[in-house]
Amino acid sequence: MHIATFTERPYADVPEDEVIKNASFFGVSNKFLDPVKGGALFNRYLDEKLYAEELGFDGVMLNEHHANPFTMGAVMDVEAAILARITKRVKIALMGNPLPVADPLRLAEELATIDMISGGPFGLDGFEVV
């Protein structure tokens, strides 16, 4: 059995009325983002992934959403590359690269690079990259 951890990596400092009036929860303006708080949160979420490895988790998972206060990870491949460099053993799984808006060749190169940095294999949408 393998155990992995996942969190949405939220940014909680958006006024509740702004979130509620946008029924789809997408398209919330970035005017509410404090870059200092955002940077601290990105580092905290990366540290949480390191801690998960320290606790014995087998994998960490990342997802991607845009203009959404519930997930700060708009470019999960960057986070995956950082984790590939700073983790030792844990598998990294990406859930949902938005293929319709990505250049397929560039995405393949980015993911192959992350796989090499991590020592591979690394997971994409639940499947290991081989």
Regions found by a protein language model. Give the residues of each.
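Glycine-rich anion/phosphate-binding loops
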Residues: G39-R44, P100-T113
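Structural preference for beta-strand elements that scaffold enzyme active sites
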Residues: H2-T5, D58-G59, R89-G96, P121-D125
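Acidic, glycine-rich active-site loops and adjacent beta-strand->loop/helix elements
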Residues: H65-N68, G96-L105, E128-V130
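N-terminal beta1-alpha1-beta2 module of alpha/beta enzyme domains
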Residues: M1-T87
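FAD-binding core of FAD-dependent oxidoreductases
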Residues: V75, D125-V130
